[in-house]
Amino acid sequence: MIKVAFFTNDLKNIDAHFGSGEQFAVYDVTKEGSTLFRIVPTGDERTEGRVEMLQDEGVDIMYCVEIGPAAAAKVVNGKIFPIKYKEVVRIEDELQKLSTMIASNPPPFIQKILEQRG
């Protein structure tokens, strides 16, 4: 299982900026599928606070539509893999893609997460 966070405004799409998104949705993802774990409001937290919130939820991978280089470095230093999309992507589509990857041939960074989680 991996834990994935999506910065989202509407809870359906990856459509929020890391620094200004008001919430993120955390999902547990396995080869069988995914389950919504929690919706986390970010409030007025700055970069460090947002990274801590992701860490507190046990997030392995974080998706957003925009993140600055300094913030991305802080996310990586927090042992979270950031993924940035330039366009809005449906959360459901990304969850299905992740489940399929886990079930078949996960890329090295996902394989490493799976091995660490045991």
Go through each PLM region and give its residues.
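Catalytic cysteine-centered active loop of the rhodanese-like fold, especially the PTP/DSP P-loop
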Residues: 64
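Short, glycine/polar-rich helix-capping loops at beta-to-alpha or helix-loop-helix junctions
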Residues: 67-73
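Non-catalytic interface/targeting segments
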Residues: 1-44, 49, 53-57, 77, ...
